Amino acid sequence: MSTDTAPAQTMHAGRLIARRLKASGIDTVFTLSGGHLFSIYDGCREEGIRLIDTRHEQTAAFAAEGWSKVTRVPGVAALTAGPGITNGMSAMAAAQQNQSPLVVLGGRAPALRWGMGSLQEIDHVPFVAPVARFAATAQSAENAGLLVDQALQAAVSAPSGVAFVDFPMDHAFSMSSDNGRPGALTELPAGPTPAGDALDRAAGLLSTAQRPVIMAGTNVWWGHAEAALLRLVEERHIPVLMNGMARGVVPADHRLAFSRARSKALGEADVALIVGVPMDFRLGFGGVFGSTTQLIVADRVEPAREHPRPVAAGLYGDLTATLSALAGSGGTDHQGWIEELATAETMARDLEKAELVDDRIPLHPMRVYAELAALLERDALVVIDAGDFGSYAGRMIDSYLPGCWLDSGPFGCLGSGPGYALAAKLARPQRQVVLLQGDGAFGFSGMEWDTLVRHNVAVVSVIGNNGIWGLEKHPMEALYGYSVVAELRPGTRYDEVVRALGGHGELVSVPAELRPALERAFASGLPAVVNVLTDPSVAYPRRSNLA
């Protein structure tokens, strides 16, 4: 009797792990060298998986998250035992809040010596599990591959997030077998369709609305629903605002895309469709909407907690199906409402014009972004790693394609930028990748410029160097009349640090120097920093409470 089943191949567990990654389309793993990971490294080498090493495990994990943000394929980081895992915890917590599909493979002390005091011995799962969708320890070489498959599936299943597996060293070096089964991501089930009565209520509200608005967020991107959202916006003629990775789903120059008119649009809307973004501090915990605004919430899963204000319709499930069901030509063209918002948008932009050409020394952040925006290509990938300097970027740098805006998300973890930028450029080598950093943020991961140089990753960074922790200094002075622990060394030469590491670096202290310096940075073909001295007296005009 014949059989078509291929015989299982015998291999060490490290190669089995790599083979299961490869079967799901994983071709890059971010890491920092660690002996507990040698068998996984060997497996990756045998399977043709690229290893990218960083100078801190935090950056390896942030880079893996950045990879997932750009590609929507789970990013993978391999972190060594003990301090390697604890160093990656901030990135894991951030990815979990961002719903970024991130798989972390951990080294671990040999199981046969647990409790005996091995180097870097600790049980990772109890402290990783609270910031992960899935956390497990391989109990043998035989189940290592199965756990990798389960981790990949957990990372992408809504709500997506972090999956963690650690591999005791003795198991990782032991022999196992692979039967060549399909990759874990080859057949993923579609999400559920929202209840019909909720869809009917939502469609009815949108059809009768006179001043509708859509507020779209990152889960539109994770839900692969960008085309459905654009169709809904255009067919129902609904103005849209976007944050996070939804920026660019509707191009910034589309007549229905708004940003400066945000307060008016959200505050005066009679119906608001909130898609893929929670009512957290970014939406004033629901307070940005008018007291009589009818709210429709659409997301991939129902939140664990109640919304902070009543919702007329909750639509939970596959976002493409949801938004497609809401699309159509029902209702009016809302032309009067759209014209009101367009007028508000134009007036707000007119008020900015003086700042865009401000010749002050040190520079105004708005002048910095006016010069940079003129050099950015339409598909540029923009990475934000800053406080106030990043907020100005959010205001000034427009997005024209989805998946082009990478910020730290609601966890607000500084130091994420170099990892995100590293991954973005590796994933999209032909596109501009621009990292916008504050001088405070540079201190978290400045040595990663060595990583960028070693791997020949030509990211261009603009540092807003105002010598302070601006997001803390200005509010503290307003509250107390003084500030403490809010100053940095003025004029620090971060550009010289980058040059010493092998990159391109320039200092800009006057406005006339900025455009030529940016042009040279883009033309250098090297990882580049333009270190711009900015005015420490300028505070971003916040309207919301971050807490």
Swiss-Prot record:
Subunit structure: Heterodimer of large catalytic subunit and small regulatory subunit.
Swiss-Prot/TrEMBL catalytic activity: 2 pyruvate + H(+) = (2S)-2-acetolactate + CO2
Stretch list, region Thiamine pyrophosphate binding: 388-468
Protein name as annotated: Acetolactate synthase large subunit IlvG
Highest taxon, organism lineage: Bacteria
Taxonomic lineage of the native organism: Bacteria, Bacillati, Actinomycetota, Actinomycetes, Mycobacteriales
Pathway: Amino-acid biosynthesis; L-isoleucine biosynthesis; L-isoleucine from 2-oxobutanoate: step 1/4; Amino-acid biosynthesis; L-valine biosynthesis; L-valine from pyruvate: step 1/4
InterPro entries: DHS-like_NAD/FAD-binding_dom, THDP-binding, Thiamin_PyroP_enz_cen_dom, Thiamin_PyroP_enz_TPP-bd_dom, TPP-bd_CS, TPP_enz, TPP_enzyme_TPP-bd
Enzyme Commission identifier(s): 2.2.1.6
Gene this protein is translated from: ilvG
GO CC entries: acetolactate synthase complex
PROSITE patterns on file: TPP_ENZYMES
Binding site residues for FAD: 159, 299-318
Pfam families listed in its UniProt record: TPP_enzyme_C, TPP_enzyme_M, TPP_enzyme_N
N-acetylserine PTM sites in chain numbering: S2
Residues where Mg(2+) binds: D439, N466
Thermal response of activity: Optimum temperature is between 35 and 40 degrees Celsius.
Inducing factors: The expression is almost identical during the mid-exponential and extended stationary phase.
Reported function: Catalyzes the conversion of 2 pyruvate molecules into acetolactate in the first common step of the biosynthetic pathway of the branched-amino acids such as leucine, isoleucine, and valine.
An individual GO BP term: L-valine biosynthetic process
Cofactor note: Binds 1 Mg(2+) ion per subunit.
Residues annotated to bind thiamine diphosphate: E57
pH dependence: Optimum pH is between 6 and 7.
Alphabetically ordered keywords of this record: Acetylation, Amino-acid biosynthesis, Branched-chain amino acid biosynthesis, FAD, Flavoprotein, Magnesium, Metal-binding, Thiamine pyrophosphate, Transferase
Family statement: Belongs to the TPP enzyme family.
Molecular-function GO term, any one: flavin adenine dinucleotide binding
Species of the source: Mycobacterium tuberculosis (strain ATCC 25618 / H37Rv)
Cofactor(s) for this UniProt protein: Mg(2+); thiamine diphosphate
